[in-house]
Amino acid sequence: MKPVKNPLYVPPGNAKECGDYALDIYAGCPHNCPYCYAPDVLRVSREEFFSHAEPRTGIVEGLEKQLREMREKGASGKTAYLCPVCDPYPQGCDTSVTREVIQCLKRYGWHVRILTKGDGARDADLLDMDDWYGVTLDGNREQWDRETMTYGGLSGEELFESLKLIHKRANTWVSFEPVLDAQMVLRTLRACVQPSPLGERHSRVADKVRIGKLDFQPSDIDWAKFGRAAALVCDSVGLDFYVTDSLRAQMRDCMSRAEFTEFIHAKWNVGDNSTLGPQLLDGAVAYAGGLKPENRLAFFKEMLPSVPEILFESIRY
């Protein structure tokens, strides 16, 4: 395997939402997730990709050289996403290289945004409140039962425990992407915020969650309905959330004006708490239809400040 020269790259697609740059530390991954897109991206067979995980040759040296050159050009304080097409903590492997990579990034004043199904708690001492440590929970019920898990990584319970530990030192997040079991994910969203006598931060397992649909594979989940339900759960427990573009697209233009009016009144009791009864609300929605799309959000935010913004996109005009 040739030494890696410039391991940092600008991430494409949804990955660009996770960092200014991305970095893949390992070649291969033993976790064998059935929905993994990495083999297709890398154009290797699934058998080959899942058969091993080994550090890319010269990854630390290549990273240090690239960071030095970028610093000379004025690039500092950026965030590196670890890792789009591998896991930074592959189970059953020596992950000391991951620690070296984080140490290298920190020496040059960079921050990290980690996403794993493995155990990164051993590197918690390297992280601070400018960093993000995240885990993937796909909602598969098997992920919560170590005895029935059919693919690798920690169980859901073990991943939650790692979040609790690292949350004392850094920001934590959960990626519910792709969602395999909608109801399981909705229950898990509520578990991300737990009552605590020590205050709000101590009550949270995750500071933010990312929610995304299963792409490029069949699913019987009603994505528009699930997206609305997930937004409502996050709003009800005060959980900061982000919906990926592909799921947001499924939610867009999926409700008639009348359905939206009925939905808002059922969920927020708008008529009981304001003068905005059903007819006035329906009229306001009709009025918004005549506004430019970029002005609708500001209009709705002023009219219904308690409603999650993403729900306004669901109206079909």
Where are these regions (language model features)?
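Generic alpha-helical secondary structure signal
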Residues: 39-41, 93, 137, 291
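Short aromatic-enriched loop/helix-cap "lid" or pocket-rim segments at secondary-structure transitions
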Residues: 35-37, 126, 253-256
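Conserved AdoMet/S-adenosylmethionine-binding subsite of the radical SAM
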Residues: 60-240, 244, 249
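Auxiliary Fe-S-binding modules of radical SAM enzymes
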Residues: 1-9, 184-317
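N-terminal [4Fe-4S]-dependent radical SAM core
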Residues: 1-76
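Surface-exposed, active-site-proximal loop segments in enzymatic domains
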Residues: 45-46, 148, 255-258
